[in-house]
Amino acid sequence: MSVLGVGPRTVTPHLRKGMMESSSGISLARAEAFLRLFAILVLVLTACLLGFDTQTKLLFSTIKKTATFRDLGALQVVVYVDSVAAGYNLLQLGRGFISAKLKGKLINVSYVTLPWVCFLLDQAAVYTVFSANTAALQASIIAVTGESSLQWMKVCNRYTRFCIQVGGALLSGYLASLLMVLLSSLSAFSLFRLYSPKQFHLLKPT
């Protein structure tokens, strides 16, 4: 028996379950913080790789043309979407930090509302980032292969370095999408663990 009179046998199953859930919640919060920080870095990297990618070439022996991400609308969308997504994840990271610091000091109107909001926002963010990246990939393939039926010439045979950097940015964008899928999965777990596994739409007792 311990000095305080609380030995291993005196710990009730309810208390033991609460301690395990608390430990699980801390581990989940740390995993989410790590993934969000990593996602922010990758999203910023993607936006910077595209935003600062330029290459100037002499065309037809007389005309200088500089290729930038603004020449392809899909690349512009990726830059803007990834920048907004990075800002969103930064806000979520700040929200998690504040929640950890103020835990137990704030009165929540509904403890299930915030997990629902985070879940829906994470879902929307990952779909938007993935869709923008895929649209840019499809447009970039045309720049590589050309499209004779539409009289679109190949571009990457002239702007090789520019296209290679775009390819690296798109790979980075898909990595960011994967990280955000993991974040969305964590949000789903954090939300649906609040519900009873035996009865649909019934919250667990707090």
UniProtKB/Swiss-Prot annotation:
It comes from the Eukaryota. GO terms for cellular component: plasma membrane. Its main location: membrane. Residues 53-71, 133-161 are extracellular. It is found in: Cell membrane. Keywords: Cell membrane, Membrane, Transmembrane, Transmembrane helix. The keyword Phosphoprotein does not apply. It is a multi-pass membrane protein. Residues 1-31, 93-111, 183-206 are cytoplasmic. Homodimer and heterodimers. Belongs to the Casparian strip membrane proteins (CASP) family. This is CASP-like protein 2C1.
